[in-house]
Every structure is written in C-alpha cells, then in structure tokens.
Regions:
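Structural marker of alpha-solenoid helical repeat scaffolds
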Residues: 52-53, 86-90, 125, 159, ...
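Helix-start (N-cap) detector for alpha-helical repeat units in TPR-like alpha-solenoids
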Residues: 25, 57-58, 91, 96, ...
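Canonical positions in the second alpha-helix
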Residues: 47-50, 82-83, 121-122, 155-156, ...
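Structural signature of tandem alpha-helical TPR/SEL1-like repeats
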Residues: 39-42, 73-79, 109-118, 143-155, ...
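Residue-level recognition of tetratricopeptide repeat
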Residues: 32-33, 65, 104, 138, ...
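N-terminal leader/linker segments that initiate helical-solenoid repeat arrays
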Residues: 7-62, 77
Length: 218
C-alpha cells in the first residue's frame, strides 16, 4: 500500500475526501495557470465552469488571473482583492499573494493609488518580502512620491543588499529630487551587479545630462 493510501486509511472518510478534493483543486489550478499561457480565453471559460461547481477560492483565483491575462486588469484586480479579504479558510501567505498580484494589476492598469493600497494590505501581512517593498515603491514613484518610494527601496535593500533593480529605482528617485551624488552612487552599485542592463545604462546617461546642466558654463 502506498504512503498516501496508508495515511488516508487512518483518516475518517470526510477528512480523506477533503484531502483528495484539495489535491484535485490544486491540480485543476495548475492546469488553469498552464492554460492561461497558451489560451487565456479558454482558461477563463473553464474558470466559469469551475465556479459554477462551488465557487471555491482556487476557482475564484483562476478566474481572476485569467481576466488579468485577458487585459481586464481592473476587474481581475478587484476580484483578487475580494478573494484576499474573503472569509474562506485561506492562508495568510495566499492572502498576501492575492493582494500583491492585485497591486501589480492595478499598477499595470495605470492606477498607482489603488496599487499602493493593495500593497499596503499585503505588507500588513508580511514584512519580509523584498519584492513587495519594490512593488510598493514602484506605485509610489508613479505618483511622484519620491521619498516614500526611497523608504520602501531602503527596506528592500535591507532584506536583499545590492539588489540591482532596487538600486536602479532608488537612483531614479534620487535623480528626480536632484540628489545627483546619491543617484550616481546607487547607479554604480547597480551596474556592479548588472553591467549590461539597458535601463541602467539609460539612467546613467540621464544622470550625466543632469550633472552637465548643473555645471556652470566656463
């Protein structure tokens, strides 16, 4: 008898059914994610069928990310937020993931204020995700909240020192507030990690141009 069978044999029938159901749902979600990569419209249609069989959290998640893949960013983001706040038995890790993905969808939709609100909620659930701090920084920078963005990037760098993306974003923010020395310092650190990054090389040109304009003519 397999290990799974042995474990199942020691459980009441209802518990065995729950475990099997969760496993089946996870397989179905994995299929949904794979389907989105090749045919998001079909994945969305399948999600509606799945929703009709019980409106389970993973079915709602499949539906939301399929909508995002179909460029229905605002609707997908709203559904992810609703799922993150739902009373279902959803882990804190999953709730944070749903809010983070909602924030990124709002940001892609050109709504950085809504994105920041979603990232705030996600950060209330976890303070150890450097990428999440970078995400909120991006939302703040999109609103020209340069110093708020820099605070988040400092938090990201405290978790992952010398992260080229975080350093590049902070260099861009420092350039925006005319801290050219700080921008140059962060940029050089970023280039040490990713010397051929096109965005960083463009940023270097922008900083040099700002420095040139700042230098008095002879």
């Amino acid at each position: 008898m397999s290990l799974i069978a042995l474990l199942m044999a020691g459980l009441p029938l209802s518990q065995s059914a729950i475990i099997l159901n969760r496993r089946d749902e996870q397989i179905r979600l994995n299929t949904c994610i794979e389907q989105i990569e090749t045919d998001a419209e079909l994945a969305y249609e399948d999600s509606l069928v799945w929703l009709a069989t019980g409106n389970r959290p993973l079915a709602r998640y499949c539906n939301a990310i399929a909508l995002i893949a179909l460029d229905e960013l605002e609707e997908g983001a709203a559904r992810l937020e609703a799922l993150a706040n739902a009373p279902d038995a959803i882990t804190l890790t999953d709730r944070s993931l749903y809010m983070t993905q909602a924030g990124n969808a709002w940001l892609s939709a050109g709504l950085p204020e809504a994105a920041e609100t979603a990232f705030d909620a996600a950060l209330n659930m976890t303070q150890t995700d450097a990428d999440l701090f970078k995400d909120r920084a991006a939302a703040r920078l999109a609103q020209e909240n340069w110093f708020g963005g820099m605070d988040d990037l400092a938090s990201a760098l405290a978790l992952v020192p010398n992260d080229a993306e975080a350093l590049g974003l902070r260099a861009r923010a420092k350039l925006a507030v005319a801290d050219l020395s700080g921008a140059e310092e962060d940029l050089e650190r970023a280039l040490d990690q990713d010397a051929e990054n096109i965005e960083l090389l463009v940023l270097r040109g922008d900083i040099r141009e700002a420095r040139r304009r700042q230098t008095p003519a002879p």
